[in-house]
Amino acid sequence: IANANMAAAIRLVTVAKGANPADYLLVAFGSAAPQHACSIARELGIRQVLIHPDAGILSAVGIGLADVVRHRSIGVELNLDQLSLSHVREQLDRLEREARGEVRREGVVPEQIVATRSLDLRYQGVDSYLTIPWPTDDDFTTAFAAAHRKQYGYLHQGRQLEIAAARVEVTGRVASELAPSKRATVSQPTSRGTVRVVFGGRMQDTPLYERTELTAGDRLVGPAIISEPMSTTVVEPGWHAEIFSGGELLLTDSGEHAAENVSYAVADPVFLEVFNNLLANIAAQMGVTLRNTASSVNVKERLDFSCAIFTADGRLVANAPHVPVHLGAMEETVRHIIAANPSLAPGDVVATNDPYAGGSHLPDITVVTPVHNAAGKVSFFTANRAHHAEIGGIAPGSMPPLSTNLAEEGVLIRNLRIVAGGESRLDELRSLLTGGAYPSRNVETNLADVSAQVAANRQGAIDLIALVERYTEPVVAAYMNHIQDAAEQKVRQALARLPAGAHTFTDYLETADGQSVPIAVRFTIHDSTSKHAATIDFTGTGPVVAGNLNANRAIVTAAVIYVLRLLVDEDIPLNHGVLRPIEIVLPECLLNPRPGATPETTPAVAGGNVETSQRVVDVLLGALGIAGASQGTMNNLLFGDTTFGYYETIGGGSGATADGPGASAVQVHMTNTRLTDPEILERRFPVRVRGFSVRRGSGGAGRNRGGDGTVRELEFLRPLTVSLITERRGPHPPYGAAGGEPGAFGRNRLIRADGTTVELPGIIQLSVEPGEVLIIETPGGGGFGKP
């Protein structure tokens, strides 16, 4: 388990840098690392491991031999051209002189001082940069293209490059050059005896060697143990070790490994944890790939996406810790795709954003990829869902506060095969995005992000195939089922700890026209050994509304899975097994509207995904009485014009529990996204961040206080359309539990250029002018227990 987790951490770091760990040699240092090195290297596909003669104290050795280094950098923010390069060169000349002076004052002679220069380059309109060493021919364009293609897998043809910053590193060489270590004539050392060691579940007699007695040229065949004063090296079966002239150990994988013999008829607790982590880490790597290759702020900076792995019949197995409202709903999407495409071929990829086929709302595009085995049969699916901040509709940002039907919310994508047999069909998606009554305002970014979603699924497929090659498909498939079984048992145990019987609760949504619409639940706990250990019945919930706070079964299911996951209070994945012991009763209502024949006659759902999902969590937790309500909203803010749309959600207070106070200024429950960095927000969009702070005292009083909300102030720099979808502005505050007081309502207001203040409702679309300031005060969380 430990080795698998360490390998996963290494893989995440290397994938984020666009590197394949299998292309490198693994250096093991520290007292324990050589014990794990062979296993970790094999997990990563690395064939060789290098162990320094002072591996156990290598960090201390390194400090003693370290060079004297000084770094200097300067912000540039200029387009890349000859004029800007000339300007940057002059600035770096000055910085280099300063740094060289500091290094000389450390006692390093000028002849031992070297300097290297680099530029932080990025495409115009993109926030992340790559650091490019200064080419001898000054051809940064070619060097950047090579680096970008290596890390991200694509280029933005024809887009202007800009210099974000310039850097110089001045190094004073202190340590003398070491002679290169070489192979020596092969010899066979004599062991000091044998010890009994378990490898691959089997006890083996293993030779024991003292490293101090090994000489250059000695070659050992694993399994073997090499002991030394500061460390111990384990040479696993299938590896051999040789000693170089400098005393280094080079371990090499012979490649003679059969698929691991893992018993799978019954779950082994160790391998259950191993596979759980392996699959979750594949999903996490998908997320890294998606973030790296995407173009939009919403994906790269706000991380508004989720990645997951599914069985051949579409059951959710594993996911990365992304956005709960995405993760719990994607299973229904994948199952709809399977039903509509029973014969997906290798190289096919399907996209959808249909809220009535497992989707959440139109900005959330889901990309689904089948993973075929060697016989051409679908074995698994990889899928991800990403929020596109612009997908068309009657308002920039594609979440119009006042939409009344699905057509007004953007472009509907239904079961579109965007890759067929490995051939891109994005032109069909382009035609869809540019057509219709309300086309997307930013088609190129849509296409770039969808391409990134395809790449993320491909990464997941590659990793799943590698997992099958290592363990065999029957083993992987069996442990996917075992993981779901384990999740089911954990949920049953959690439900058994709750009081039996029916627990009811009702809370309310506040619509744009001032209505209070109930969401009611009856959470009944049965015998934990029965087929359904609990029934969650939403009978009594209000009817379909004219606005866009309608949700769907997938969103409700996501909220239920999330709350069940909270009850377990252990680190288990959100997967299909969580729902097995649960019966969900969902009549036709605002949580389960009936679609119309066309988008124009289909109920709107833009706010249901973000706001109604939060209220469903509130009523479920309220029924159980285990926490005060959290802020109960995502505080959705959108602004834009005919050329762009921007979207963010704003954190607030979380509810207190019997165990402690609520957290302040956090995203809660069904969202897990970040805010865009102020520097990036101000550079990319016509807005200035005037303030962002904790709203002190907004959490509800109680034995444990609710968390405080936030105050966000934005000044607009040009005429824009602004949309707000923000619940808990009154008359229903975030409730307290067990006698705790409710959290404070949220509040929205606009400061006009002349200084007058306009109070704004929770759901509104308005026009703003340059110099006007929007202030959003988010709700606090409810308290727990009497104050």
Locations of the language-model features?
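C-terminal, non-catalytic interaction/recognition modules in large multi-subunit enzymes and RNPs
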Residues: 1-5, 9-21, 28-787
